[in-house]
């Protein structure tokens, strides 16, 4: 057992430092092609690269371990200190991805066929997960790899709506203007704004506003973007109509949308992950997340799904991303125990 643990930690150290050295912000995933070709050859896992998104698929089987290879922008030089690995994506989500790759390798060596994916664009518009759902893939079970503290199993994510609003007005000299598009729209923003308060209440948050071209002329055009988040019990259409009613004189366009997801605690993946943690004397927690993940998309191609992964979720998107080799080992062990149970029951 100790020998296996040291093998996993040594391989995790090697692979994670290698992957962290490759800068892969969203839309730049092709930078990791040689890494996945090396993994394919070393671990004897068939490699497929999805053409539209440049997502990487390793192995074959009816069980999918799905994480993502892209990160938020901002390269952090990878390093290791006392079995703690630092770097952009160490937590979100190259750490979980490496755990999944090692688990898939070890499981396939045992004759348990598992597919693992390094999907593209999760930090943007999830084009990798979306392409996967269009490729006629269907899986008995999917585990999504995101940092969940190594103890938490995510059973619910909120949905999101990304809205562009374009408004127009007649420009006037600022010294004598009777109206002002910035002022008028600002009032409407305040009226429609819903601050993020708790999971069950929707939020409507302005994130971008652009207007004006000259110091002394009121704007003729204004661009506004809203990021809308809502739980599965909220009514999507009511939220959109509320914004439409407030901005009747403006054009409104949904530029991206991700549905909410909620799974039963009796879902086979949830139960197998729970038991896998208990076997390691780790107390599992079932949680829900205010953001979105590829789980929101991948629910379309399976009836059994949940999210779990190593890494402190509080460090996501920060310049302090770090993960320990012990955390990665727990992730590998949890994925393996869960999939072995699912495999036996299928």
Curated annotation (Swiss-Prot):
Q: Where along the chain is the active site annotated?
A: 70, 122 (proton acceptor)
User: Pathway, per UniProt?
Assistant: Amino-acid biosynthesis; L-lysine biosynthesis via AAA pathway; L-lysine from L-alpha-aminoadipate (Thermus route): step 5/5; Amino-acid biosynthesis; L-arginine biosynthesis
Q: What is its EC number?
A: 3.5.1.130, 3.5.1.132
**Main location group:** cytoplasm
Q: Which residues bind Zn(2+) 2?
A: 92, 123, 317
Q: Name one GO biological process term.
A: lysine biosynthetic process via aminoadipic acid
Q: Does the keyword Cell cycle apply?
A: no
Catalysed transformations (reactions): [amino-group carrier protein]-C-terminal-gamma-(L-lysyl)-L-glutamate + H2O = [amino-group carrier protein]-C-terminal-L-glutamate + L-lysine; [amino-group carrier protein]-C-terminal-gamma-(L-ornithyl)-L-glutamate + H2O = [amino-group carrier protein]-C-terminal-L-glutamate + L-ornithine
A single GO molecular-function term is:
zinc ion binding
Q: Which cofactor does it need?
A: Zn(2+); Co(2+)
Q: Which residues form a coiled coil?
A: none
* Entries under InterPro entries matching the protein: ArgE/DapE_CS, Bact_exopeptidase_dim_dom, LysK, Peptidase_M20, Peptidase_M20_dimer, Peptidase_M20A
Q: Which superkingdom is the protein from?
A: Archaea
Matching PROSITE patterns: ARGE_DAPE_CPG2_1 (PS00758)
Q: Where in the cell is it found?
A: Cytoplasm
Q: Where does Zn(2+) 1 bind?
A: 68, 92, 146
Q: How is the cofactor bound?
A: Binds 2 Zn(2+) or Co(2+) ions per subunit.
Q: Name one GO cellular component term.
A: cytoplasm
The answer on whether this UniProt entry bears the keyword Plastid reads: no
Keyword line: Amino-acid biosynthesis, Arginine biosynthesis, Cobalt, Cytoplasm, Hydrolase, Lysine biosynthesis, Metal-binding, Zinc
Report the family membership. Belongs to the peptidase M20A family. LysK subfamily.
Question: What is this protein's function per UniProt?
Answer: Catalyzes the release of L-lysine from [LysW]-gamma-L-lysine and the release of L-ornithine from [LysW]-L-ornithine.
PANTHER family tied to this protein: [LYSW]-LYSINE_[LYSW]-ORNITHINE HYDROLASE, ACETYLORNITHINE DEACETYLASE
Q: Write down what this protein is called.
A: [LysW]-lysine/[LysW]-ornithine hydrolase
Q: What lineage does UniProt assign to this protein's organism? A: Archaea, Thermoproteota, Thermoprotei, Sulfolobales, Sulfolobaceae
